[in-house]
């Protein structure tokens, strides 16, 4: 999915320390759109508590707040090495370490908020209302589906 236009707009409109949380909230909204489209009852992510700024209890709560379906995090209490071991076992590790610029490297704030205030986050998101729905729809309409077969 091309999320770049959404990220650029958020980057231009919102406080940089809130970028990661706001971007993740919009990623979750889009993920939920596809989950509902495919009659899925929940989202599943690979987040592990405390690994990065966006994975504190407060950050996860702020991210979850936009979802109307459950979000499962089976790796939530695992340490990084346990997650790497599992990713090697299920043949996703090599893909996970491929070098490329993504939203985590291009749009990272020097000092990301680790305890986001939901009132402030929502106030920042209000600045996005002029264009964000159209940008999200474009991203949804141009998604590329890749099927991964597990053995």
Across the structure, where does each feature detected by a protein language model lie?
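Active-site adenylate/phosphate-handling loop in enzymes that bind or generate adenylated species
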Residues: 4-8, 13-85, 89-90, 135-148
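The feature marks non-catalytic terminal segments
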Residues: 98-151
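A short alpha-helix-loop-beta-strand transition element characteristic
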Residues: 91-99
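Short active-site-adjacent structural elements
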Residues: 52-54, 80-84, 96, 105, ...
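Phosphate-binding glycine-rich loops and their immediate beta-loop-alpha structural context
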Residues: 1
């Amino acid at each position: 999915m091309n999320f770049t236009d959404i990220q650029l707009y958020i980057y231009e409109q919102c406080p940089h320390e809130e970028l990661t949380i706001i971007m993740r909230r919009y990623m979750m909204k889009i993920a939920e759109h596809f989950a509902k489209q495919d009659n899925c009852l929940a989202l599943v992510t690979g987040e592990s508590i405390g690994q990065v700024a966006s994975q504190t209890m407060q950050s996860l709560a702020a991210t979850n707040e936009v979802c109307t379906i459950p979000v499962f995090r089976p790796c939530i209490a695992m340490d990084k090495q346990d997650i790497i071991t599992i990713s090697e076992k299920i043949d996703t590790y090599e893909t996970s370490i491929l070098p490329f610029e993504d939203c985590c490297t291009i749009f990272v704030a020097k000092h990301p908020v680790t305890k986001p205030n939901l009132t402030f986050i929502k106030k920042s998101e209000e600045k996005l209302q002029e264009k964000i729905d159209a940008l999200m729809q474009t991203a949804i309409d141009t998604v590329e589906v890749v099927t991964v077969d597990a053995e």
